[in-house]
């Protein structure tokens, strides 16, 4: 992870490298147009596309029962997620932050992909057999795309099920439940629950020989930058795709909020599937309103021009 200094050539042209909510950023100037909701027209663009980039956010997982931590109900205990998901919060109170992430991990172990995740994964597999390409660029850290079967996957904000040692830097998959004995039964989200105040030495620790450093979730926190190599790969996909599909994103967290509008700016069709309009909606070719699990499967289903294999 490169901090502070990384800038891509085009996609992050305004230094939107750090993970930040839109309230801390200037708004993007968008062309004010009304996107189409004509599914037949989208399907025509879909049939012609050879390289599809699918960008997903929290909305695609909401139908799996995953808490989004947005809006008036977006609290864990009395804290908003953006106040817990920071390096400063972890430095001040690693026990509280680990309780929060332990809760999220335990919730996710009970969740399954919904029809939107499955439609994306099935489409990727089907198009691969036709010599076409579909990649998924997700802001989600829940791994539901991977669980659904997606393979060309960029988890740009990391994963709940990977840890990083604050001492040696080792990143490792971790699906333990609980992740450590001291967190067993902890992390309840209700506002009247008190912090467990777990001693730091009892929190998740690195198991590398001679290390035993404190582990942290391997996710990108607010104020941190995305991995430069990963962001460079994402940039290449977005610069070469000929169709972009945006699913369940709020378009308010940077740098991901810039991805689809800049694809649209080079004349590539962009289709948004969401429960509501976003700050970027008017820059897109298509907008399909409704639950992603309902609207997306027919949009990505086999087209009549596709060869059956």
From Swiss-Prot:
Superkingdom assignment: Eukaryota
Tell me the GO molecular function terms: histone deacetylase activity, NAD-dependent; NAD+ binding; protein-glutaryllysine deglutarylase activity; protein-malonyllysine demalonylase activity; protein-succinyllysine desuccinylase activity; zinc ion binding
Pinpoint the Deacetylase sirtuin-type domain residues. Answer: 36-306
Q: How is the cofactor bound?
A: Binds 1 zinc ion per subunit.
Where substrate is bound, by residue? Answer: 101, 104
Q: Which Gene3D superfamilies match?
A: SIR2/SIRT2 'Small Domain, TPP-binding domain
Its EC number(s): 2.3.1.-
Question: What's a GO biological-process term for it?
Answer: peptidyl-lysine demalonylation
The subcellular localization recorded is:
Mitochondrion; Cytoplasm, Cytosol; Nucleus
What Pfam families does this protein's entry cite? Answer: SIR2
Keyword annotations: Cytoplasm, Metal-binding, Mitochondrion, NAD, Nucleus, Transferase, Transit peptide, Zinc
Chain sites annotated for binding Zn(2+): 165, 168, 206, 211
Q: Where is the active site?
A: 157
Cellular component per GO?
Answer: cytosol; mitochondrial matrix; mitochondrion; nucleus
Q: Which reaction does it catalyse?
A: N(6)-malonyl-L-lysyl-[protein] + NAD(+) + H2O = 2''-O-malonyl-ADP-D-ribose + nicotinamide + L-lysyl-[protein]; N(6)-succinyl-L-lysyl-[protein] + NAD(+) + H2O = 2''-O-succinyl-ADP-D-ribose + nicotinamide + L-lysyl-[protein]; N(6)-glutaryl-L-lysyl-[protein] + NAD(+) + H2O = 2''-O-glutaryl-ADP-D-ribose + nicotinamide + L-lysyl-[protein]
The record's section on InterPro entries has: DHS-like_NAD/FAD-binding_dom, NAD-dep_sirtuin_deacylases, Sirtuin, Sirtuin_cat_small_dom_sf, Sirtuin_class_III, Ssirtuin_cat_dom
Transit peptide residues are: 1-35
**Which cofactors go with this protein?**
Zn(2+)
Could you say which enzyme class this protein belongs to? transferase
HAMAP family on file: Sirtuin_ClassIII
Instruction: Tell me which family the UniProt entry assigns to this protein.
Output: Belongs to the sirtuin family. Class III subfamily.
Q: What is known of its domains?
A: In contrast to class I sirtuins, class III sirtuins have only weak deacetylase activity. Difference in substrate specificity is probably due to a larger hydrophobic pocket with 2 residues (Tyr-101 and Arg-104) that bind to malonylated and succinylated substrates and define the specificity.
Q: What is this protein called?
A: NAD-dependent protein deacylase sirtuin-5A, mitochondrial
Species the sequence originates in: Xenopus laevis (African clawed frog)
Q: Could you tell me the gene encoding this protein?
A: sirt5-a
């Amino acid at each position: 992870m490169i901090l502070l200094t990384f800038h891509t050539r085009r996609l992050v042209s305004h230094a939107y490298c750090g993970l930040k909510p839109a309230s801390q950023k200037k708004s993007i100037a968008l062309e004010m147009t009304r996107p189409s909701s004509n599914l037949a027209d989208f399907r025509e663009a879909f049939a012609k596309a050879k390289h599809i980039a699918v960008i997903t956010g929290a909305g695609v997982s909401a139908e799996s029962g995953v808490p989004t931590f947005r809006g008036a109900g977006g609290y864990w205990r009395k804290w908003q997620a953006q106040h817990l998901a920071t390096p400063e919060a972890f430095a001040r109170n690693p026990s509280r932050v680990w309780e929060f992430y332990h809760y999220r991990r335990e919730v996710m172990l009970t969740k399954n992909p919904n029809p939107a995740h499955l439609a994306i994964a099935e489409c990727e597999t089907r198009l691969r057999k036709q010599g076409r390409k579909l990649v998924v660029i997700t802001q989600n850290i829940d791994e539901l795309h991977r669980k659904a079967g997606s393979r060309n996957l960029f988890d740009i904000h990391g994963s709940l099920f990977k840890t990083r040692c604050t001492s040696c830097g080792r990143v490792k998959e971790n699906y333990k439940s609980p992740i450590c004995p001291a967190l067993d039964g902890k992390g309840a989200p209700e506002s009247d629950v008190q912090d467990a105040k777990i001693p730091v030495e009892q929190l998740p620790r690195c198991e590398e020989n001679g290390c035993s450093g404190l582990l942290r979730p391997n996710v990108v926190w607010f104020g941190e930058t995305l991995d430069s190599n990963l962001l460079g790969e994402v940039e290449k996909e977005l610069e070469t795709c000929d169709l972009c599909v945006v699913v369940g994103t709020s378009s308010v967290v940077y740098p991901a909020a810039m991805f689809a509008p800049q694809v649209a700016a080079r004349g590539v069709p962009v289709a948004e599937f969401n429960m509501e309009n976003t700050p970027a909606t008017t820059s897109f070719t298509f907008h399909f309103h409704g639950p992603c699990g309902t609207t997306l499967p027919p949009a990505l289903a086999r087209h009549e021009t596709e060869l059956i294999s």
